[in-house]
Amino acid sequence: MKQLSSAEVRQLFLDFFKEKGHTIEPSAPLVPNNDPTILWINSGVATMKKYFDGSVIPDNPRMANAQKSIRTNDIENVGKTARHHTFFEMLGNFSIGDYFKEGAIVFAWEFLTSPKWIGFDPDKLYVTVYPEDEEAKTLWREKIGLSDDHIVEIEDNFWDIGIGPSGPDSEIFYDRGPAFGDDASDPELYPGGENERYLEIWNLVFSQFNHNPDGTYTPLPKQNIDTGMGLERMVSIIQDAPTNFETDLFMPIIREVEQIAGVKYGHSQENDVAFKVIADHIRTVAFAIGDGALPSNEGRGYILRRLLRRAVRYAKVLTINEPFMYKLVPVVGKIMNSFYPEVENQTDFIQKVIRTEEERFHETLNEGLAILETILKTAKETNEQVIKGADIFKLYDTFGFPVELTEEYAEDHGLKVDHAGFEAEMKEQRARARAARADVKSMQVQGELLANLTEKSAFVGYNSTEHVSEILYLIQNDTLVDEVAAGNEAQVIFKETPFYAESGGQVADKGTIESETGLAYVEDVQKAPNKQNLHRISVKEGVLKTGDTVKLAVDKVKRRETIKNHTATHLLHRALKDTLGEHVNQAGSLVSPDRLRFDFSHFGQITEEELTKMEEIVNEKIWEQINVVIEEMPIAEAKELGAMALFGEKYGDIVRVVQVGKYSIELCGGVHVRNTADIGLFKIVSETGIGAGTRRIEAVTGKEAYRFVTEQENTLKQAASLLKTTTKETPQKVELLQADLREVKRENESLLSKLASAASADIFESPEEIGGVKVIAKQVNAKDMNQLRQFVDNWKDKKIGGILVLGAVQGDKVNLISAVSEEAIKAGYHAGKLLKEVATRCGGNGGGRPDMAQAGGKNPAELGTALDYVSTWVKEQQA
């Protein structure tokens, strides 16, 4: 067997399929681009869905890739098994309507067994097939020459994820030999069984059916091939490693952890699990952050937080008790740099994010662990088998413990956790539902009509907004028609069109279509599968017919305002990087006639000074009157120029480059101004956070910017008029008013304090004595909780002692406060527990510390009854 590094295996795979006429697709970012059905890119085929469902026709039906992927459905198994990972690479080759079973099988066998490529011993390879797939069985026997004892029929060899493409599959296994299993009585010791001897290395999926919504299966218009080979498994075989973790993909990370911990790998099973968890999780977190994800409390951000905290938990097994994960990022970058330079290129930023997250967790971890240990100890002492949901929630809410982390600690002590109770506790406090867990959703059922419309349509709208063209296709209700009459909507493809199809954030053009017999409006334009511009139209007069000569006219006003915003977006993108750092990446955009919206990755808040600086930079470039140069060139040449690419977008060999002087160079298919002076003015309207690590800037240009500035100026003039001052002196006038207001508030609080002191004599007079404890429970007049707290302060000053509960009505609400003296606390009384009981009796809730608590209620009519309960509660505590 050849001795190969992981990088060599990856490159061999891609070189092989390139030689076989495949286009090598770049690895897509882990954060899906325009695919809300999945949390992460979790397979090679996840980036190919648009080709498999027929919504886009690829330039070359043969494709291959090495795709970084994340799957997190088995996190608890990572580190405890030989092959579970949260981050992995999938090598795949794909055919969209080109070669089918024979081609896929022949390619796979050649790559695995040819001395030019991997060079495996054919006798060590076994395959599994779907029992009804006679074609595949025949190919393996007759084309490849496998004997029947190397072909295993398995009922589960049918790939089906619901509605959409499906079909049988054939898996290839490598026999690692008797050392990995030799028990003839083991019912799982066969290719496809649960064992370590026969390792699955490649899955060939023969996508030949549509799984229809009614549950039936019909042949696909085009048969497809989707294959997947796990790089980590393949490398473990080639490098003769007992598990994936002993390969060159993981061992440098493990060696670095050894240095940090002062503990050796391979001497303790418990320690080895910790090493594996850390090595796996740092790869996932580093790549995910590099691709735009950031730790948070929901969605993919929650996954990152959970992985980091799980790694920190296991690091304690290795006696690592301080932030350290960030130190591993350069190691990950170096291992993967030959094919994935993104981690090494962003090392500083990724380290900063991870270190910040680690430091936050360490601040609360030890305190949380102490509480968890108490909870676990109490559960054992009381023979409870389940950790209560309320306890899990407290650890999650106060100390940042993911419920899964608590569950792992509980499992170590032989206990389970109350998931239902935890969810009940979460329900009231959860403001936003967590994002759906990662799983591949059904692809669309393949459609034939648009995919079969192959006549080319040229876009001529970069330099013209009017054009005479011909109607190639008219489509109504998914059917080709010869004509469309007034009052109907349809889809149209023209021979040439000046109408821009929505893409890259730029909205579609609108406008008119005129023929000798009809008039129609263009409402929207999208890309058809074969890359023609597909126009959605409404016919207003007469009739439009296939073959008609038509005059197409784009709405010039809307187009003019749109292109101002598009070029301004490019300037803003560059200004963001110059101001905040090169880590900023575009996460989405909207370019419309009236505004622009730009979403971008950034870890942290943006200051007013930074916003002002960005706005100034963009306006300076506008006023410099820079020519905008647009040209097509090979992508390699564009990269040499330093052109920025849209994050997550895929590009062909020839790309369109938009250059604003030397300041901004981007790959872009949109329409732009000829000179930055055409933009006129740029004004940021708002800046907000829209999710974990994602910010949004909205801005206006040209006349909309002028209107915005004018509105703000008018508002300032109105404020100045009300303040009886000039616009220039308005800020100073407001400061004086604020100072006056603070003084009035101070005087008011002083007066309220005196009134409270005066009222206290009546409130605290003649406390009830219950079992030697002084108890005061009264309704008082207090305008807010602050005044109630003043009553408590007076009670403490008078050293009355015992228990105090006060309630006040404000409109349709109740404010409650309680206090317990030090002596009463020692006797077992608790202000928080008492007030919780009182509050529930007047429609509220709340709680607090043993010495003081406050709460609210929604039923003022029940306040008297609630306060009467205080005496009952005290007596119950004494019973």
From Swiss-Prot:
Family membership: Belongs to the class-II aminoacyl-tRNA synthetase family.
Keywords, sorted A to Z: Aminoacyl-tRNA synthetase, ATP-binding, Cytoplasm, Ligase, Metal-binding, Nucleotide-binding, Protein biosynthesis, RNA-binding, tRNA-binding, Zinc
PANTHER family referenced in this protein's UniProt entry, alphabetically: ALANINE--TRNA LIGASE, CYTOPLASMIC, ALANYL-TRNA SYNTHETASE
Keyword NAD among UniProt keywords: no
Organism: Listeria monocytogenes serovar 1/2a (strain ATCC BAA-679 / EGD-e)
Role summary: Catalyzes the attachment of alanine to tRNA(Ala) in a two-step reaction: alanine is first activated by ATP to form Ala-AMP and then transferred to the acceptor end of tRNA(Ala). Also edits incorrectly charged Ser-tRNA(Ala) and Gly-tRNA(Ala) via its editing domain.
Broad EC category: ligase
Cofactor note: Binds 1 zinc ion per subunit.
UniProt cross-references to InterPro entries, sorted A to Z: aa-tRNA-synth_II/BPL/LPL, Ala-tRNA-lgiase_IIc, Ala-tRNA-ligase_IIc_anticod-bd, Ala-tRNA-synth_IIc_core, Ala-tRNA-synth_IIc_N, Ala-tRNA_ligase, Ala_tRNA_ligase_euk/bac, DHHA1_dom
Chain sites annotated for binding Zn(2+): H566, H570, C668, H672
Cofactor(s), by name: Zn(2+)
Gene Ontology cellular-component terms listed: cytosol
Localization (cell): Cytoplasm
GO process annotations (BP): alanyl-tRNA aminoacylation
Molecular function as annotated in GO: alanine-tRNA ligase activity; aminoacyl-tRNA deacylase activity; ATP binding; catalytic activity, acting on a protein; transferase activity; tRNA binding; zinc ion binding
Protein name: Alanine--tRNA ligase
